[in-house]
């Protein structure tokens, strides 16, 4: 098969979590012998911020880490869709693309494109910003891949797409796995108690970070570290006052080695996900569990039963968060049991290979054929 992906960026994951899962999907397709071409805008804001924050050498590093990535950076006014889509069998268009490009690809498909065309939505805007999402012209698309049942239902209820399927994110377990601590970046940090990898959140979880991370860490006097971007000066001062080391942006593919240097991590979802998107944990949960680190999560509604009780610990209040942190640090054997259980669920149900299998089944269903025949196109 020839797969074509249009996305915001795979070269940069600066404040851009969609890159994590999509890199894993591309890698898995390639491991199965399929050709994958990726198109991203030359002026992608994630790339521009990465260059400003870490320099051009980070783009080179991404290519070294993912040597098989075939990424073309295009200018919107000169993109030749006939050339880009020539010979395509499956085309995925992520929702972080312009309304104009989404429509142009749909029109290309309507003019006789023989590929399967799917729109991929991994954001809360279909529930929280209906006006923006309703502006996408998906009339010529074969369907929508939604990263949660609530998103799928939203598309069907509003008539935005012909069909929609729930297609959750997952972990790239070739990259995200338990590993020894490394000093690749010239660092030699002692093993810490807790690490949080995540961005401040544009006021979507500022209070939650104060209540469920900064407060408990300060009261327990933990050796803690935070990686992420868009932390205002006030937030950095609060972290410092709590004794938390703020370490800035971390390339996503380095997360496993950072997890390996710490005894536990936490998940603090953004407010819109908890309030309006039940069943969607976001990519960080999958990746942390894949790395075999004990996880304490703020409560979120796992209404789709993605995980088993005990795969991670749940804290409904700041006091519960503090207690769960203390329990894991006090009882290493129990912490190891939690970590093993969480990783086992990822390996059994939530890898990028599982999602590629699901995507191939969806494609076969649309074509009225078997997966085997899809693969021989």
Regions found by a protein language model. Give the residues of each.
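Conserved catalytic-core segment of nucleotide-activated headgroup transferases in glycan assembly
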Residues: 172-261
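A short, Lys/Arg-enriched amphipathic alpha-helix followed by its capping loop at the start of a domain
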Residues: 24-34, 215-220
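Extended catalytic core of nucleotide-activated donor transferases of GT-like folds
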Residues: 9, 15, 23-27, 37-155, ...
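Short hydrophobic "strand-cap" motifs at the C-terminus of beta-strands
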Residues: 6, 120-121, 147, 197-198, ...
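Catalytic binding pocket for nucleotide-activated donors in carbohydrate/polymer assembly enzymes
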Residues: 21-24, 40-41, 236-367, 371-377
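Short amphipathic alpha-helix
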Residues: 18-29, 211-212, 359
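Carbohydrate-associated surface elements
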Residues: 150, 167-170
